[in-house]
Amino acid sequence: MGFHSKNNSEYNGDFIILSSIYYWMILLYCIKFFLSKYLIYCMSLTYIDLFSGAGGFSLGFDRAGFHQLLSVEIEPHYCDTYRANFPDHQVLQQDLTTLSDDNLLRHINHRKVDVVIGGPPCQGFSMAGKIGRTFADDPRNHLFKEFVRVVKLTQPKFFVMENVARLFTHNSGKTRAEITEQFERLGYKVKCKVLNAADFGVPQLRSRIVFIGRKDGGEITFPEPSHTEYNTVGDAIGHFPKLNAGENSLILNHEAMNHSTQMLEKMSFVKNGGDRNDIPESLRPISGDVRKYIRYHSDKPSVCVTGDMRKVFHYEQNRALTVRELAALQSFPDDFVFLGKKIAQQQQVGNAVPPLLAQAIAEAVLKMNTNE
């Protein structure tokens, strides 16, 4: 009984056939993969993020399915953080006032912009209306006018502008009306509302005014609260390893700052959720910001996170919160990295739009666009 064995040419022929099959299978998979990515790219609503900071607003819009075209931020450390977390985004480290119309359009390849988002710093609240000039005329509010300029240039379907809640009532509501009028002159229907981030899952009582403009004149709707029971400080940061003042950890940005012996002694008297009144009168600070020398309450949302939380202590550990913990109170994910010196990192966190709030706003914009 004989055995038939294949010669080399037959083996080579089989190998070539199999290789060809695998080649076409891989090629078809790659075509399908990149085609799906391209379709998502083409169908996604696009946005520009002005005064983007560390990227809280961008993160929320990305999660809702938007496609970023450009972000503009002047501060170097903010840009470093943004680039580290959004490697596929285009971010310009530049003063928006020096970015010409032509260069802005060139950076986005003259693509259609669907949404312009941002929170322009407005410093002229205290004086506008009191010395005979309007909010828009106050030179300290020139960045607001830059936001208006970009909206006028790109003519997006929508714009979303976020700012501090006191703008709603400033100058008996005249400032709010003036801002609205600036955009109405460009043909936008505009509404504004004060939103509390805690209503959307952020473990923090943080109220912000949000202006939404719509180019087609359709109905403007704001996101409906998703949380009647608020997430708490304990919910947000209870899983992080305990640290003493000055200690570090292997977790990203989870490094405790040093405190003076006097500060640690004073704060040792303050109970969970307590304030300076818990400190013995002989040690108690006589004056100063009432928002300092307090402890977070483990079973309540956080007080509003700012760029300096060094005298607001952990509910059970005798130290201020780490950047990682503060970021969690702003609803940033645990893998979101913050770069720069610690105080710069804290400022990045405190000045950010909470991603969960941003996502809720983005989803409201998507819904309006779908129902146009």
Swiss-Prot record:
Residues 45-372 form the SAM-dependent MTase C5-type domain. It is an enzyme of class 2 (transferase). PROSITE patterns: C5_MTASE_1, C5_MTASE_2, SAM_MT_C5. This is Type II methyltransferase M1.HphI. SUPFAM superfamilies: S-adenosyl-L-methionine-dependent methyltransferases. CDD domains: Cyt_C5_DNA_methylase (cd00315). One of its GO terms (molecular function) is DNA (cytosine-5-)-methyltransferase activity. A methylase that recognizes the double-stranded sequence 5'-GGTGA-3' and protects the DNA from cleavage by the HphI endonuclease. It comes from the Bacteria. Keywords: DNA-binding, Methyltransferase, Restriction system, S-adenosyl-L-methionine, Transferase. It catalyses: a 2'-deoxycytidine in DNA + S-adenosyl-L-methionine = a 5-methyl-2'-deoxycytidine in DNA + S-adenosyl-L-homocysteine + H(+). Belongs to the class I-like SAM-binding methyltransferase superfamily. C5-methyltransferase family. GO terms for biological process: DNA restriction-modification system; methylation; negative regulation of gene expression via chromosomal CpG island methylation. Both this methylase and M2.HphI protect DNA from cleavage by HphI. The active site is at 122. Pfam families: DNA_methylase (PF00145). Its EC number is 2.1.1.37.
